[in-house]
Amino acid sequence: LVTTSSKWTLPPGTIVTGRWKGERYLIQRLLGQGANGVVYLVKQMKSSRLYALKMGFDTIDLQSEINVLKALQRRKRKIGSTGKRDLSYLVEVDDYSLEGKEIPFYVMRYVKGEPLRAFLAQQGSRWLNVAGYSLLQQLEGLHGLGFTFGDLKPENVLVSPYGEVELIDYGGVSENGRSVRQFTEWYDRGYWGAGGRTAEPSYDLFSFAVVCIHLLAEAPLKEVATGLPQTRSKGDLLAIVQGEASLQPYRKWLERALEGKFRSTAEARQLWREQVQKQVMQRKAKSPTPAWMMGAFTLSLLLLLCALFFTFWN
């Protein structure tokens, strides 16, 4: 057990046994740590299935998060969401006894993958096209249920080898119209004086725009992010988008997201798809990239788009 400032992490190999239901989970590794808890990759002992398990630093805070996830489940059942992909938000809720304390935890489904930053470092920044589209699909589904993710940042986005995205750590998920429960400053539009912290689709789209800037133009973002609050503004972000070559393929989308001009997440997803298709066509026309490599990337993109289409519309 590692403890720092009342926060702790459990090492790989630790077995977490639920006090009430008795399920046993073997910790594989740490997936992420936020303001209100830690998320682990775990293996259920009886089935060997992998899940994401979150433990909370504060019982009341985590219970509030669990209540939001349960509300998501109820809303999804009421709407009658269908599809082949399992989109369950909760697998199990229980307590873990540690050093005389009861630590609440919940278990969620897990998609094997890497954090977004690590994925792009391995595969290349071009794969943001695929992962970004999948992320917008995830957000569109969440927004359609009446909720905003809130704490959208690279650490909370896992990407499978084929670019499929899974959101982890739902600590910031908030019902639309209410205040965002949890956020990270750099990705918060209030931090940039670009709007309030009301939970709504445009809040997540703004956050994703800053995530893109962070991943593709980190140095200039760091420079303006550390400035004085009274001088920091949305205009700084727009200037980076307009001035950095790495962001030009996404310029139109990023500007609209930062300005809050998308009418819906579906519209944002559609524009993202259009800009990806445009990039593919341009590369086919002039890129020296080997044909086999371009074909592999294009095929992966098409397969993902088809899979996502049938998942959400069947």
Language-model segment annotations:
Residues 100-115:
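Conserved short submotifs of the Hanks-type protein kinase catalytic core
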Residues 131-132:
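Activation segment signature within eukaryotic-like protein kinase domains
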Residues 139-160:
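Catalytic-loop of the protein kinase fold
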Residues 80-104:
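Short beta-strand micro-motifs within the conserved protein kinase catalytic domain, predominantly
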Residues 171-240, 249-251:
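C-lobe/activation-segment region of protein kinase-like
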Residues 1-20:
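Juxta-kinase regulatory segment immediately upstream of eukaryotic protein kinase catalytic domains
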Residues 278-314:
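C-terminal single-pass membrane-anchor helix
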Residues 24, 28, 35-67:
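ATP-binding glycine-rich loop module of kinase domains
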